[in-house]
Amino acid sequence: MHDAKSATVREDTRMRLLRTSHLGPTLLVTLVAYLLAIPLWRPSSALVIALAVFTGQLCIGWTNDLVDLENDRTQRRKNKPLASGELLVDVVVRATYISLGSCILLSLFGPLGIRGGLVHLLGVGCGISYNFYFKRTWLSPLPYLIAFAAFPSCIVLSKKSSVPLWLVFAGAIFGIAAHFSNVLKDMEPDRAAGILGAPQILGTRISLLITGSSLIAISIILTSVTHKPFLIPVAFIAMLFLFLLPKKFSFPLIMTMAIVDVSVLVTAGAASLALPH
């Protein structure tokens, strides 16, 4: 009976840790990493690369909630296990260190190699530095820009000596779109809590404009690579809806466009980066 109860507690803790890691975005980034790695590596090696990315994303997600703990408690964020008291701080801190150590080992000694591994760790470091510092400054887009440019680049560098510029620019611009769209849903609570990054300083309207413009820029880049011209009018329509629809619909609309662009980015990357195994 005691063993069964202990197993249940351990399972509950694992599930709460996954919830605290911002599991949706973490899994999405991991999936994109795997899809980009498949043309360059055999499936088993691609899985190791995906695991390196997954452990890095866990670190970023957990440090985000650790840094925001007091603010989340003030706002009574019951959907966050740390803020609600369902998960102990020490447990998350310990899990973060374990995940970070695993990420370093998998990045440097796995298929990514030293060059690709260091670039990947640069991206992870940018994500963590955003949580601890940049989130509250007007330079808040910078870590996103660097991290999202590094993300596809590290996978390419594991097999090639250089990275296509279109992939670097598309990743960087998507990082800007991801940052501004991610902040939109919490714009007012962030301001009330004194979190004044670039989106909070510029305001909702300009943040929407930057997000929409970024998605259009990505669509133009992807169209030049994939020859799929439908992306550009779709991006313009999405940008129009950003301003016409109520604010509560803005984030789902942006994420829908982001998913479309990421899907095409993966397809374009696979087609142009394919190498014999």
What are these regions, as identified by a protein language model?
Residues 2-277:
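Multi-pass alpha-helical membrane architecture of UbiA-family
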